Amino acid sequence: MKKVLLLITAILAVAVGFPVSQDQEREKRSISDSDELASGFFVFPYPYPFRPLPPIPFPRFPWFRRNFPIPIPESAPTTPLPSEK
């Protein structure tokens, strides 16, 4: 744990001490209307761009379908209730 903390501290110290040049021309272009994109990479509008969507019943809980393979009947049970005897 101490080694990880020391490594993170060293990386931060190097990053803070590294000189950064100020590009005045780029700052002027960025402030004005420019054709630069807001982000450097394209983000897909939905999470599944190259594969089909997940199955509908339990898309967020795949473990539920694996651990509970009990079939659910579509109709009501045919046995009469105890009060109807």
Curated annotation (Swiss-Prot):
Coiled coil region boundaries: none
Q: Which residues form the signal peptide?
A: 1-17
Is this entry keyworded Signal? yes
Q: Where does the record place it?
A: Secreted
The record's region (O-glycosylated at one site) falls at: 75-83
Q: Tissue expression, per UniProt?
A: Abundantly expressed in tonsil, lymph node, and trachea; strong expression in prostate; lower expression in thyroid, stomach, and colon.
Q: Which Pfam families match?
A: FDC-SP
Q: Which GO terms describe its cellular component?
A: extracellular region
Keywords for this protein? Glycoprotein, Secreted, Signal
Its post-translational modification remark reads: O-glycosylated with core 1 or possibly core 8 glycans.
Q: Does the keyword Glycoprotein apply?
A: yes
What the protein does comes down to: Can bind to the surface of B-lymphoma cells, but not T-lymphoma cells, consistent with a function as a secreted mediator acting upon B-cells.
Recorded protein name is: Follicular dendritic cell secreted peptide
**Encoding gene (name):** FDCSP
